[in-house]
């Protein structure tokens, strides 16, 4: 007869009428019993012949993609003009006095952030905007292009002007070396960037103050150039022998963006401004050839080139426009749905390209992208606005992947110890937090996004169209892209974007000037940045508890009035550093703070309501006696694991699920196991904060016996059969807790100290978790442990009772941490063992 739920509860000692613990508990460590229960609950039967279930409620397999929905009404969010102050360290020091080594190190990391991948793969421009919504291809193209344009206008992106120069909007930083009319403007090293002087020679760089910029130019392998890149890949980048080839290649490419990807387009006609400016640029380029023979001090000729003047004059002045869009003006309409009708709606379509307020030199950047972009809903609650998704997953994949730095995340107990108090709370919303952190221009060649222009995009999507060849084609080739769909889409978009349609139909390549979200480095940098800022705030306002995780910043104070005045001063301080807050999204929580998915109050911590609801829904949909795909089990365990610390049996209760995921087998829920989990998650117990105190109860064990020292008295007992030492120590700790009721127990076993009971026999782990809930452990060396003698059967000998103080841990998120001294020789990348990584290791 299968094991009933009631019987199973009794077995786990979850009911009160169980026999004496010293007899009952060691039975749960018995392997035979564990095996029989597993068979009864159908936990060990992993090989099933019935087909697997691949969907449980909203949970599908980890890799099955949920199809995003395109919303034609999406609004592009507006971005404030975010400019983090370059002298942020000085400003903080004026405010709070000298910073600690830790704070300085963290702030230097992001001023500016640097990114050097091992290898960068370049993709053709066609892959710039992902064809995520085939039904709405044109609409998605323009909305994405508009989003990119908005980011560029907000100073978040660079626009590639030539192979070696880029333009941007907003205030420049000192490491962004400005070019003016093809000359380099050096900014003095005083990091304020107020004074600047022009270098004498015509655009020759004698020695760049920005090391990595040149370094990444000279390391050809870093750019991973492919041979088919034509003139770009000719000549090693930075050898003085190939100046002639390089001046040719750079002048030929110094206008806008040429999609040199798949050979459809002849370069000379691809950019609107090229015909007008080509001859002028040739002259200037050859005239400076004589100077560019001079060597720079590093022994490499490094040349810069003239940037074409602004393309603002109307294109109609030129002879015959090379612009795809404007060519329709001079052609006969091919049908009722010809694009000529749309192009003739306006007399002045504006410039073909726009240039930023500042031009800077950049390392050699090919006319390619390194990641695709597409739009999705901003978040599940806000479907009116869009969010740009950037796919830079190439840096996390394959043998050349970048190993991102690890960083500490406060675990649940540390978080509770820190934040569970009777303070009033509010949380600040940092708007576009990632886009606060500036990136060094040397990273630009690795983080490129863009688009190949509308004609190429449309041609790629319609399989019928022939290769477009602008220059030698007849007018008919121009009309190859005309279609009813395109015509209708463009007419609708014309209402939204007006003359911008022309600008957006041109190819463009953009590099990130601030850190993008799609790179594993970004969360690390953001965490360093906000934690350093909170650390400064805590010192500046000693009565305020400021804490952050990523872009979630919370402030706590004794009273609501105090909190409001702190809020005003701290907001002003953050604004003075250039940090943008969203005042409408400031949330006042009263005494129970919502943070990181938890509700934290003076009583302790519980999961937020929406997570509890999700768990209830999950159990409602969970099928019994049907094998469930292990990928779906991963999603279920992810949800249940988050709330596991609040249940009686904790993580150990989920061990059978972990085991099936590890062996990549389907898992079948038996009615009893499902009922057990269901009841576990129906009643959640808060995790309370640990209190400091003196330890007076000690436990110790040998494989054959256990001993306790409670105050001045001792106790001992023996096991029926010898047990593994860790199991024996865990049993001793359970006996100590149940005999004395003490919440503070001294032990010399590291596994018991860690409070992770997932590696013990399953039934014992579940029972011990419930018995030891809310217990804190203090480490006592074996030699000093008063329970050592009783455990060896010697009760008469008393060691002096230790007074071991216990201090609650706040993990690495300590508020008053003295910064550790930095070793003289740092390894290439520092790895912090994150508590999150450690806590989630399956057995």
Curated annotation (Swiss-Prot):
It catalyses: DNA(n) + a 2'-deoxyribonucleoside 5'-triphosphate = DNA(n+1) + diphosphate; Endonucleolytic cleavage to 5'-phosphomonoester. One of its GO terms (biological process) is symbiont-mediated suppression of host innate immune response. Residues 347-690 are annotated as: Polymerase/reverse transcriptase domain (RT). InterPro entries: DNA/RNA_pol_sf (IPR043502), DNApol_viral_C (IPR001462), DNApol_viral_N (IPR000201), HBV_DPOL (IPR037531), Rev_trsase/Diguanyl_cyclase (IPR043128), RT_dom (IPR000477), Viral_Replic_Matur_Polypro (IPR051320). Residues 357-600 form the Reverse transcriptase domain. Residues 178-346 are annotated as: Spacer. Keywords: DNA replication, DNA-binding, DNA-directed DNA polymerase, Endonuclease, Host-virus interaction, Hydrolase, Inhibition of host innate immune response by virus, Inhibition of host RLR pathway by virus, Magnesium, Metal-binding, Multifunctional enzyme, Nuclease, Nucleotidyltransferase, RNA-directed DNA polymerase, Transferase, Viral immunoevasion. Residues 1-177 are annotated as: Terminal protein domain (TP). GO terms for molecular function: DNA binding; DNA-directed DNA polymerase activity; metal ion binding; RNA-directed DNA polymerase activity; RNA-DNA hybrid ribonuclease activity. It comes from the Viruses. The record marks 63 as: Priming of reverse-transcription by covalently linking the first nucleotide of the (-)DNA. The keyword Metal-binding applies. Mg(2+) binds at residues 429, 551-552. PANTHER family: PEPTIDASE A2 DOMAIN-CONTAINING PROTEIN-RELATED (PTHR33064:SF29), POL PROTEIN (PTHR33064). Hepadnaviral virions contain probably just one P protein molecule per particle. Terminal protein domain (TP) is hepadnavirus-specific. Spacer domain is highly variable and separates the TP and RT domains. Polymerase/reverse-transcriptase domain (RT) and ribonuclease H domain (RH) are similar to retrovirus reverse transcriptase/RNase H. The polymerase/reverse transcriptase (RT) and ribonuclease H (RH) domains are structured in five subdomains: finger, palm, thumb, connection and RNase H. Within the palm subdomain, the 'primer grip' region is thought to be involved in the positioning of the primer terminus for accommodating the incoming nucleotide. The RH domain stabilizes the association of RT with primer-template. Belongs to the hepadnaviridae P protein family. This is Protein P. It comes from Hepatitis B virus genotype C subtype adr (isolate Japan/Nishioka/1983) (HBV-C).
